[in-house]
């Protein structure tokens, strides 16, 4: 499913954000590209939930949390997000790429993936997808895009 999400993001969302797309056409295009229908449907559902989160239609508790609260990860979240990923999320909060609400969106979308464990590169892509359509997060998106595509110049995080 994650490969489908990356393909969709690079092909449709990132390159043509204003374009209205027909979900049936996208499904057919993805199937023609060699993706399995189940992965395609899971990816499209994942994106629908993300859109609902971004519009505040789901999980309104995300917007009522105290921004100074400390995030304690559940056992399942710790299994899925290793120490490097959790540290990177904290780093993104410290440099204000993520706020408490967008952090929770990222964690929600990570937990909805069908992967038992997420690596740092996958996490960066999910953060980029979450930030992509949120008004007011354009600078955070640009910063995250730079972090995703940066070549290792000795940058520590």
From Swiss-Prot:
Pfam family, one: DUF494
Family of the protein in this entry: Belongs to the Smg family.
Protein name: Protein Smg
Organism: Yersinia pestis
Organism phylogeny: Bacteria, Pseudomonadati, Pseudomonadota, Gammaproteobacteria, Enterobacterales
């Amino acid at each position: 499913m994650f490969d489908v999400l990356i393909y969709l993001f690079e092909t449709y969302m990132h390159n043509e954000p204003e374009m209205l797309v027909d979900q049936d056409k996208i499904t057919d295009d993805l199937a023609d590209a060699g993706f399995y229908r189940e992965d395609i449907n899971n990816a499209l559902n994942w994106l629908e939930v993300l859109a609902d989160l971004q519009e505040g239609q789901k999980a309104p508790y995300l917007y009522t949390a105290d921004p100074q609260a400390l995030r304690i990860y559940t056992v399942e979240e710790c299994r899925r997000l290793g120490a490097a990923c959790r540290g990177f999320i904290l780093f993104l909060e410290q440099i204000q790429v993520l706020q408490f609400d967008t952090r929770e969106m990222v964690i929600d979308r990570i937990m909805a993936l069908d992967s038992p464990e997420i690596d740092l590169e996958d996490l960066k892509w999910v953060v980029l997808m979450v930030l992509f359509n949120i008004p007011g997060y354009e600078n955070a998106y640009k910063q995250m895009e730079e972090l995703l595509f940066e070549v290792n110049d000795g940058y520590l995080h």
